């Protein structure tokens, strides 16, 4: 005997209206994640090139 599987999604007519804000929110999260990754990569590059200067400047500004 073969069993048939069905996939249910959403609530019918409301799919188009509710997908808009969720899709926009997802795009915003992806953009923020991408921006954060870019910033962290930039920080890594600076630290690789002149970590000593970075640490010295940080300590002079009151860091511990």
Swiss-Prot record:
Record PTM text: Is modified by deamidation of its C-terminal glutamine to glutamate by the deamidase Dop, a prerequisite to the subsequent pupylation process.
Entry-linked InterPro entries: Ubiquitin-like_Pup (IPR008515)
Modified residues (Deamidated glutamine): 64
A Pfam family annotated for this UniProt entry: Pup
Spans annotated as Disordered: 1-38
Comp. bias (Basic and acidic residues): 1-11, 25-34
Pathway linked to the protein: Protein degradation; proteasomal Pup-dependent pathway
Isoglutamyl lysine isopeptide (Gln-Lys) (interchain with K-? in acceptor proteins), cross-linked positions: 64
Domain notes: The N-terminal unstructured half of Pup provides a signal required to initiate unfolding and degradation by the proteasome but is not needed for pupylation, while the C-terminal helical half of Pup interacts with ARC to target proteins to the proteasome.
Family: Belongs to the prokaryotic ubiquitin-like protein family.
Protein name according to UniProt: Prokaryotic ubiquitin-like protein Pup
Gene designation per UniProt: pup
